[in-house]
Amino acid sequence: MAKKQSILSPIIRITFTFLVLCGLVYPLIVTGIAQAVMKDNADGSLIYNDKNEVIGSKLIGQNFTDPRYFHGRVSSIEYKAEASGSNNYAPSNPDLEKRVEKSIEEWKKQNPSVPVTEVPIDLVTNSGSGLDPDISPKAASVQVERISKLTKIPKETLEQLIKDQTEGAALGLFGETRVNVLKLNLELQKLMKQ
């Protein structure tokens, strides 16, 4: 009996010690460092409106359906963050072809003046997460004609807006040149109010 207690005692102490270290101490230290070093990222990269209300995150895409605004990538999960993921069909899968064709048909309805051959692939395909907040600058530019027509904002002004909102690759190495759709639409909204 004494032998069982002598074996059990260190096991319980080690378990409790690691429970406190890994479940309490480590998360508090990491959270503290994140808040000190990169507060915006640690808080979710939230975007606020003029009334200081949270309207979204730079990291999570939103579904813009109003034709006066720039549209982001297609989402198979309807931009529901709790269901992050995508079907990730293989290029040979007929379901992928059907979904892309459906996206192209939607595109043609809203942008009849833009040839389908000019539609960037990121406007008709899903991202891996289904929540991608960014599109390529070209994907933003092909929407300029529609937006200009509906908002009466000159095309040149919209093109400059896209350039102003374009971000380069992270550290000049990782990823591609991109435009955050939410931030772009917020700037567009300011132009529409003028």
Swiss-Prot record:
Keyword annotations from UniProtKB, A to Z: ATP-binding, Cell membrane, Ion transport, Membrane, Nucleotide-binding, Potassium, Potassium transport, Transmembrane, Transmembrane helix, Transport
Cellular component terms per the entry's GO annotation: plasma membrane
Main location: membrane
Function description: Part of the high-affinity ATP-driven potassium transport (or Kdp) system, which catalyzes the hydrolysis of ATP coupled with the electrogenic transport of potassium into the cytoplasm. This subunit acts as a catalytic chaperone that increases the ATP-binding affinity of the ATP-hydrolyzing subunit KdpB by the formation of a transient KdpB/KdpC/ATP ternary complex.
Subunit relationships: The system is composed of three essential subunits: KdpA, KdpB and KdpC.
Family membership noted in the UniProt record: Belongs to the KdpC family.
Protein name: Potassium-transporting ATPase KdpC subunit
Native species: Bacillus cereus (strain 03BB102)
Name of the gene encoding the protein in the UniProt record: kdpC
